[in-house]
A protein has these predicted regions:
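Short, Lys/Arg-enriched N-terminal segments with co-localized hydrophobic residues
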Residues: 1-11
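Rossmann-fold NAD(P)H-dependent dehydrogenase/reductase core
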Residues: 11-193
Length: 193
């Protein structure tokens, strides 16, 4: 008897890779921030946390899209506590504004799920001049975590979850080594993979 999960209704793969008891824990009174929660793994994560009673902040660039997903979830689960807030991890100013609001509005934060990410983008830079994938997937989340860390510590036992991919290892047939001496492709041809 595996508990029903948010994953049972969407396009995501179905294998259950966690202890089923975790999916029935009462999370009432707890608060989570999930980045990139308007689609994919982030949306499934936000929905599952809400189904278990948590208040979930969907931290997304496209707030209207997140609000549409929230409406769909609440139509099916009227007691779900979800809200959308704007967060663009490609802008450190946006990260600072988001964290400032969270710190001002909430007295506790039980979990931060750093899920948002971009992959195989054309060569672009963030608002702050960093290569887009490094800026969004790493630097934006690093700053967000740093700015919410005191709130997370005060809410202990809290958690920080960093979602990643196996592509770091596979690199689509490439050697997979991170070129730390040229992270921003200043001396070599850009490769989105």
């Amino acid at each position: 008897n595996v508990p029903k999960t948010a994953n049972d209704e969407g396009p995501m793969p179905k294998p259950l890779l966690c202890d089923p008891a975790l999916l029935t824990r009462d999370l009432s009174g707890r608060r989570y921030v999930v980045t990139g929660a308007n689609a994919g793994i982030g949306l499934v994560t936000a929905k599952q946390l809400a189904l278990q009673g948590a208040h979930v902040v969907l931290a997304c660039r496209r707030v209207a899209e997140a609000e549409a997903r929230i409406s769909e979830i609440v139509a099916e689960h009227p007691n779900a506590k979800l809200e959308a807030r704007e967060l663009d991890l490609g802008s450190l100013a946006s990260v600072r504004r988001f964290a400032e609001r969270v710190n001002a509005d909430f007295d506790r934060l039980d979990g931060l799920v750093n899920n948002a990410g971009v992959m195989n983008t054309p060569k672009q830079t963030t608002a702050d001049g960093f290569e887009m994938q490094i800026g969004v997937n790493h630097l934006g989340h690093f700053l967000l975590t740093e700015l919410l860390l005191d709130l997370l510590k005060r809410s202990a036992p809290s958690r920080i979850v960093n979602v990643s991919s196996c592509f770091h290892d596979k690199a689509m047939g490439r050697d997979g080594d991170v070129k730390v001496d040229d992270l921003f492709y200043e001396r070599r041809k850009y490769d989105g993979w």
